[in-house]
Amino acid sequence: GPVRGVIRIRRAISHSTVTQDLVLHADSSRLDFVTAVDWGDERDVLLKAAFPVNIRSQRARYDIQFGSVERPTHWNTPRDFAQFEVAAHKWADLSEGDSGVALLNDCKYGYDVRDNVMRISLLRAPKSPDPSADVNKQHRFTYSILPHDGDYRNGVVRAGYELNVPLLGAVVAASRGKQSAEESLLAVTGDNVVIETMKKAEDDGGIIVRLYEAHGCRGQRTLRTSLPVRRVVETDLMEKEERRLTIRNGRIRLNFRPFQIRTLKFVL
């Protein structure tokens, strides 16, 4: 249809069955592999997906909490060879010059990139510590391939969040409310600052908002809110108050260092 195209593939692998929906959305370069695996009585098997891409780079970048880290794509030393895979959260990216490819996922954390081949670990059947942990069970997960211009800073961080926290649509009845047709509880200027957390404060009725800089850049950004905030206080990660910030017309100006984490408390 006009929203997305889907191709379904079923295949047998060893003692297991894999069903995949290859989903390409309109106006998007992201290709999703929506996967269901009936993981059979496997032993000493590691299921991976591999993507040979037309990109050459000596280093790949991997998503971690509140940032990302670069690692080599070669296994020239015993130390490199021992890291047959590394941990990452929502994506791994391989870029050169003005283009790159990101490999995204919604619940898998084992990656390896060697030369121009990007791989992600999907399921395991080890002998220890628990040989029955995953076998003879059904598993569902999604991973995606995303070609892009530039490097990871050109939309890859956002794409990782869009896959893991997809937009949910809802139909609501019309009303005569006071809100405008478009409204956000929170919004921040710039693509390099992410609103990671919004939650109730642990010790009082305040609202905790945690942001971080995702591209390794310095700069000033403006946080906007439609909440009736009376006071804004910056805290540490334990929510201990450190200093009061200025808010004017629902806007707060914030300076960020590369990969800096900032935690704010809104007093309503």
For the regions a protein language model found, what residue spans apply to each?
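C-terminal (or distal) subdomains of carbohydrate-active enzymes
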Residues: 1-268
